[in-house]
């Protein structure tokens, strides 16, 4: 019988073996179902230039497909805005939702390969939580992903990556993502002194 553990993504193994235990010890959960877990990762690209040029949106869809391994859904404008020459129903972006194995594989690539390639990287913001344990990370350009060919993309395109967790508070979610290896900025000395 083949070894099934080799098919489990590295980040999922890390969660099962160390993250869950560390969170239980830190927060004193009584039940394993109380321990926060990562539910999904959503990637969103708003392509405002798609109003004038449809090829820009096709490039964004192609890049997102290469990055995630899934075909993205096209997002459309909900209302018309004359100043932007935007009409209701026009395609203006794309998004992908990753769950289970693809989610853990993407998180592994993001933490170990992509974030270290970001220019002048000093850690990700500790404040981008929504109050319900979810975190959103913004990237200025998609070319930090090694899957993409830089010659194919004329203009850099930014994206938002949202981590949806089952955590009740931002502190629990921050600790879980930190244990996964997310490189958060260290709190400034004023914040540390104010907390003490």
Curated annotation (Swiss-Prot):
It holds the Pfam family Ribosomal_L5_C. InterPro entries: Ribosomal_uL5, Ribosomal_uL5_bac-type, Ribosomal_uL5_C, Ribosomal_uL5_CS, Ribosomal_uL5_dom_sf, Ribosomal_uL5_N. GO terms for molecular function: RNA binding; rRNA binding; structural constituent of ribosome; tRNA binding. One of its GO terms (biological process) is translation. One of its GO terms (cellular component) is cytosolic large ribosomal subunit. PROSITE patterns: RIBOSOMAL_L5 (PS00358). Keywords: Ribonucleoprotein, Ribosomal protein, RNA-binding, rRNA-binding, tRNA-binding. NCBIfam families: PRK00010.1 (NF000585). This is one of the proteins that bind and probably mediate the attachment of the 5S RNA into the large ribosomal subunit, where it forms part of the central protuberance. In the 70S ribosome it contacts protein S13 of the 30S subunit (bridge B1b), connecting the 2 subunits; this bridge is implicated in subunit movement. Contacts the P site tRNA; the 5S rRNA and some of its associated proteins might help stabilize positioning of ribosome-bound tRNAs. Part of the 50S ribosomal subunit; part of the 5S rRNA/L5/L18/L25 subcomplex. Contacts the 5S rRNA and the P site tRNA. Forms a bridge to the 30S subunit in the 70S ribosome. Belongs to the universal ribosomal protein uL5 family. This is Large ribosomal subunit protein uL5. The lineage of its organism: Bacteria, Pseudomonadati, Planctomycetota, Planctomycetia, Pirellulales.
């Amino acid at each position: 019988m083949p070894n099934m553990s080799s098919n489990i993504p590295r980040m999922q193994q890390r969660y099962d073996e160390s993250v869950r235990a560390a969170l239980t010890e830190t927060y004193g959960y009584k039940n394993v179902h109380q321990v926060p877990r990562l539910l999904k990762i959503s990637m969103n690209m708003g392509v405002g230039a798609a109003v004038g040029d449809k090829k820009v949106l096709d490039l964004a869809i192609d890049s997102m497909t290469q990055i995630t391994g899934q075909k993205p859904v096209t997002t459309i404008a909900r209302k018309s805005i004359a100043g932007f020459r935007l009409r209701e129903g026009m395609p203006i972006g794309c998004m992908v939702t990753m769950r289970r194995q693809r989610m853990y594989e993407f998180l592994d690539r993001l933490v170990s390969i992509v974030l270290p390639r970001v220019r002048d990287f000093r850690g990700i913001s500790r404040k981008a939580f929504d109050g319900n344990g979810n975190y959103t990370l913004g990237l200025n350009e998609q070319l930090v992903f090694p899957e993409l060919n830089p010659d194919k993309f004329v203009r850099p395109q930014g994206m938002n990556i949202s981590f949806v967790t089952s955590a009740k508070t931002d502190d629990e979610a921050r600790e879980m993502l930190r244990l996964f290896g997310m490189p958060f900025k260290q709190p400034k000395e004023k914040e540390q002194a104010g907390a003490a």
